[in-house]
Amino acid sequence: MDATVILPILKKKLAFLSGGKDRRSGLILTIPLCSDQTSMDELSVTLDYLLSIPSEKCKARGFTVIVDGRKSQWNVVKTVVLMLQNVVPAEVSLVCVVKPDEFWDKKVTHFCFWKEKDRLGFEVILVSGNKLTRYIEPNQLTEEFGGSLTYDHMDWLNKRLVFEKFTKESTSLLDELAVINNGSDKGSQNEKERSVDFNYLPSVDPETVLQTGHELLSELQQRRFNGSDGGVSWSPMDDELLAQPQVMKLLDSLREQYTRYQEVCRQRSKRTQLDEIQQKVMQVVSWLEGPGSEQLRTQWGIGDSIRASQALQQKHEEIESQHSEWFAVYVELNQQIAALLNAGDEEDLVELKTLQQRLSDVCYRQASQLEFRQNLLQIALEFHSVSQDLSQQLDGLLGMLCADVAPTDGATIQQTLKLLEEKLKSVDTGLQGLREKGQGLLDQITNQASWAYGKDVSTENKDNVDHIQGVMEDMQLRKQRCEDMVDVRRLKMLQMVQLFKCEEDAAQAVDWLNELLDALLKTHIRLGDDSQETKILLEKHRKFVDVAQSTYDYGRQLLQATVVLCQSLRCTSRSSGDTLPKLNRVWKQFTITSEERVQRLEMALAFHSNAEKILQECPDLGETVMDFEQFDEVEAVGKSLLDRLTVPD
């Protein structure tokens, strides 16, 4: 019977075990009859409960029952005494009925207990409260009987409730732990293949029960020796009442079973963790080798333009994003496996290392494939970028070559030629870079077959290779056409430079002739003072005419060259129409002036020669008769020369 069931009755204190003992070490059971309203049924229940507490050894020493009838009537006392016969006749050795100071009427108490000893099974004595110490030591009596033993019924009841709760919970917990531990020992191998279920969890917390037990034991041990003056004061919490050894035994059993339970939980937790890790590892491996690998199997193209390559890169980033989630799980699993490996459980080392190795192999292989694909797409993007830049350069060069050339001077043509050469050099550099990128991309595509998972990628690779080679060949052909056009344009522009040079030089020849004519008119006027000087002037004039003739011939040749160049260039000369008439006009004027100059010099030479001859033959005019005919001839030449000089040049 639990105290909680009859708690309202126990609180009435109809009977109690104070913890005191008689001289035979038997326990003292006190029944305080406080009123005539005492329920015999409730008293019987109380006695049954109290007498179930002591151990069998304690019961064998017998009980001394104190029936306090000082505040009750005799018939109630008699009823209680007779009830003891029915409740515990074998355990009761002595019943002390404490009578009131004013004894009951003899008519009432005519019943003689001593005569009924054989029938009752125990001795009954009537005693005054102050005479009770004759049978029981004072320190074993409570204060209401003049003793020194302290008893707090509610305190005892509360401790009793705690004890019963602990006993009940600990006993139940021990049974549960035993079932769990024994079940684990019998089926440890099968447990590895099962997850934790409700049977592994006790109905109460073992830590809480142990804590309650330790607190209860501490209370018992503290109250076991709480007397004064070196004496021992027995309390209702004595080990014979609440079985302190029983609490200790329960605690020892609990600790043992709980330790085993903790080990079982640790093993099961480790097994569960290992199963979860294995399950997650298989999930990661299954996804990477399944959907993840399938995603990579479908991605073999490199695109045919920058936009196409960028679209493939974006698709690859989406694939990488999905993989990164599983790689994060891999990192977490790897840390968990490392922690379990560091725990040093030999039985799981091989399995853990196998899981770790397989997980690492799959993840690293998949990561390598992702990186390879990313590098391939990056190289493809660079290839298409270089190809596009080169195509734009070729388009610009072609546009420049197809445009009409209308330079105004040679410097502009030289600048244009320099720009063409620079563009052609840039195209050559771009084509070289395209070849390098293309070769690198071809090498990567060749290595791509190693990631094919057994898939025949020859078709995909052939398309990629054909595209790359086609782009490079197309760029080479375009570059060659541009080079040919540059050669033609270079020749044309050089001819234009030559044309401009011829036109400039022809104009310069006209200027030179004008300068020669101007010099002839302004500075070539002396005829000489004698024949010798005139001869010298005549010789200089002939050389002067030769220079003018050379200049005129040079100008004519330049103008003829411009005609040929214009025919070759299919253009009209800017100056040949004006320069040639100017050249001819200046040359004609120069020729007329030159001939006039020659005639004058020749007449002057004839005049000086005849005059000098006359003077040489007739040195003394006063004494010699002159040859008048010769003189007349000289005079005639002189007059003719004077007349010639009066004619404008």
Swiss-Prot record:
Family to which the UniProt record says this protein belongs: Belongs to the SOLO family.
Q: Which InterPro entries match?
A: CRAL-TRIO_dom (IPR001251), CRAL-TRIO_dom_sf (IPR036865), Spectrin_SESTD1 (IPR056804)
GO MF term (any one): phosphatidylinositol-3-phosphate binding
The family database entries (SUPFAM superfamilies) matched by this protein are listed as: CRAL/TRIO domain, Spectrin repeat
Q: What is this protein called?
A: SEC14 domain and spectrin repeat-containing protein 1-B
Supply the alphabetized keyword list: Repeat
Role noted for this protein: May act as the primary docking protein directing membrane turnover and assembly of the transient receptor potential channels trpc4 and trpc5. Binds phospholipids.
Domain CRAL-TRIO residue range list: 1-153
Q: Which organism is it from?
A: Xenopus laevis (African clawed frog)
Give the gene name: sestd1-b
**Organism domain of life:** Eukaryota
Spectrin repeat extents: 272-378, 381-494, 500-602
